[in-house]
Regions:
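Nucleotide-activated donor-binding/catalytic signature segment of Leloir-type glycosyltransferases, i.e.
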Residues: 258-285
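Acidic donor-binding loop of glycosyltransferase active sites
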Residues: 92-96, 160, 272, 288-305, ...
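A short, well-ordered alpha-helix in the C-terminal region of glycosyltransferases
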Residues: 350, 357, 364-379, 388-391
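N-terminal subdomain of nucleotide-sugar transferases
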Residues: 1-63, 239, 383, 403
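Carbohydrate-associated surface elements
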Residues: 168, 189
Length: 403
């Protein structure tokens, strides 16, 4: 089996998108399949049309001409993507074209697939229109939103098979009129061997951050508005009334960071919060080891209700204690009171109470940690998830032969 993966971006850029991609490629190689990787102009400027990064060979796509006219820019990008996909496909001769979100990859892949007689699998990791709302480039229900949704639905209809990352997105796809038997969930997972459980804290790092003797709450990830970190800061102000030793460790960065710093100052808790900044991936474990309770207070919106995140799975793999809002993406992953704790989304007071509940129930910590680890080991390994592609590819090949 030879698969050409068409990607928005990949290494050396690090993101949840990249982590999922590399996990898929690694497991597909373990199955004996040959994979080829092509990134689109959203990778950014590249020195050459082919590049080796961390042992992976990537084909790159030249940048799209700079155009500010909405619609024309995307059309030019898709035209450039189609030309490059065709060029690479003719060179590597794949059996399958596997396009991953966004739709700007899917439609060119479908066009090239029809030209070369190749089946196309489209992996919808998030809907393009909801991602645009998240990035602030449109609003739900706007003309651009509706046009983006129509384009996404058109791509879903044109693909031979569809994969997605969770049940929430699967229901959304079927709700667009796509046949249910055309859609397969390939759930997010973790490489449990990559995460240490119960590793001792780095005391030098603890001292450097001023966390000696502290009860540490934490979040590690991107600081976007939908993550609800403002609620976590508000909850900290409440928790400090009963637990003056509490501190909040925020590791990462993002567009919402200035607003978070201002909120901390307004509430008078700026000296109780450590903004550690972005840290190299190889160093992230050291920060995890300092945190007593992780928090994932995502706000409720279409994106968070439909899409499952990776972070809670990583927390379970490390036997971490965590609380999370009860958005749909979290409910699909977390068994309340068993592998983690849920609280009503958007409610800072409930978040504070839930964190206090965890801190006050130390006797249950070993059971919670073991249950989380067991869940990912038994249900959310990448080997288990990626094995599902075998049937997807077989159906795509059969559909193309029958057409």
């Amino acid at each position: 089996m030879r698969i050409l993966h068409i990607l928005d971006h990949s290494l050396p850029l690090h993101s949840g998108y990249t982590f999922r991609t590399i996990a898929i490629l690694r497991e597909q190689r373990a199955l004996g399949w040959e994979t080829f990787q092509l990134t689109t102009p959203r990778q950014g400027a590249c020195a050459a049309l082919e590049e080796d990064v961390d042992g992976w060979h990537f084909y790159r796509t030249p940048p799209t001409p700079s155009v500010v006219v909405p619609g024309l820019r995307e059309w030019l990008e898709m035209r450039g993507n189609a030309a490059r996909i065709l060029e690479v496909a003719r060179a590597v001769k794949p059996n399958i074209l596997h396009a991953h979100s966004p739709v700007l990859n899917a439609l060119p892949a479908i066009r090239v697939g029809r030209c070369l007689g190749l089946p196309v699998v489209y992996e919808m990791r998030a809907s393009w229109e909801d991602a645009a709302v998240d990035h602030g480039s449109t609003t739900e229900g706007s003309l651009r939103y509706r046009a983006s949704r129509a384009l996404e639905t058109h791509a879903l209809r044109g693909a031979d098979q569809i994969t997605t990352i969770c049940e929430g997105l699967r229901r959304d796809i079927v709700g667009r009129g796509i046949a249910a038997d055309k859609v397969t969930v390939i759930p997010n997972a973790v490489d449990v061997t990559a995460f240490a459980a119960g590793s001792p804290p780095d005391e030098a790092l603890r001292r450097s951050l001023g966390l000696e003797g502290a009860t540490v709450l934490g979040f590690i990830g991107s600081f976007y508005a939908y993550e609800g970190l403002d609620l976590l800061i508000e909850a900290l102000a409440t928790i400090l009334q009963q637990r003056p030793e509490a501190r909040l460790l925020l590791v990462g960065g993002g567009s919402h960071e200035p607003a978070l710093r201002q909120l901390a100052a307004d509430l008078g808790v700026q000296d109780k919060i450590i903004f550690a900044g972005r840290v190299p991936n190889a160093q992230v474990q050291r920060y995890y080891d300092l945190i007593d309770v992780l928090a994932y207070p995502r706000r409720s919106m279409r994106l968070t209700e439909l899409v499952t995140p990776l972070k809670p799975l990583e927390a379970m793999a490390q036997e971490r204690l965590f609380v999370a809002s009860d958005v749909g993406g979290h409910r699909e992953l977390i068994r309340d009171g068993e592998t983690g704790f849920l609280f009503p989304a958007g409610d800072a007071a409930a978040l504070a109470r839930t964190i206090a509940r965890v801190l006050d129930n130390r006797a249950a910590w070993p059971r919670l940690r073991a249950a989380g680890r067991h869940f990912v080991e038994s249900e959310r390994t990448w080997a288990r998830s990626v094995a599902r592609y075998a049937d997807v590819y077989a159906r795509a090949l059969a559909a193309r032969r029958a057409s």
